A protein has these predicted regions:
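Feature captures the catalytic cores and cofactor-binding loops of soluble hydro-lyases/lyases
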Residues: 17-145
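Short hydrophobic-aromatic micro-motifs
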Residues: 9-11, 46-47, 149
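Single conserved hydrophobic/aromatic residue that forms the stacking wall/gate
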Residues: 1-7, 11
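Active-site/ligand-binding-proximal alpha/beta "capping" segment
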Residues: 73-74, 150-170
Length: 170
């Protein structure tokens, strides 16, 4: 995987916010054969629950949520064609394997910088589960949004390789 092109590819895709409550509802839709709020195949999910937008902005503070909370749902969505996930923190081995198996990628966004991140999201539209408030599913457009390729489709894992590189032996 060319890590530089992976990030630029996200800017060409639809990016959807989805956290715990939305993932639970999406899973129920799949299990019940109900329509999904968006096409999973080829999509990117940003684990975030943005705040209300201030005047002149498309979105409020929009920092990443801890991704491991979605690990129970991620392999299923990756097997349905999800191409990218964006969040913070490590992923389970089951998710890492599903990323490899499906040719997907996991990006980390900068935690604690949600107020700055909103400046890189010029478009935001609530598309599903409006009753969930900040956890509703939103369609976003990223523009120069800072991302780090953290787990790639060939087994690269920055969390593991970083520890190996800096771990003292002996």
């Amino acid at each position: 995987l060319d890590r530089s092109s992976a990030a630029s590819d996200v800017y060409k895709r639809q990016v959807y916010t989805s956290r715990d409550a939305a993932h639970k509802r999406i899973k129920a839709c799949i299990e019940n054969g109900e329509p999904l709020p968006y096409e999973i195949d080829g999509a990117a999910i940003y684990y975030a629950g943005p705040t209300q937008a201030k005047d002149g902005m498309a979105i409020g503070s929009c920092g990443p949520t801890t991704s491991s909370r979605m690990d129970v749902y991620s392999p299923m969505l990756l097997d349905m064609g999800l191409s990218a996930m964006i969040g913070k923190g490590e992923r389970s081995e089951a998710v890492c394997e599903a990323i490899r198996r499906n040719g997907a990628v996991y990006f980390c966004a900068i935690g604690g910088a949600g107020a700055l991140a909103c400046k890189c999201i010029p478009e935001c539209e609530v598309i599903a589960f409006e009753d969930l408030g900040c956890e509703s599913v939103k369609r976003l457009r990223f523009e120069k949004f800072p991302l780090i390729v953290t787990i790639d489709c060939v087994g690269g894992n920055l969390f593991k390789s970083g520890r190996e590189k800096y771990c003292r032996k002996g």
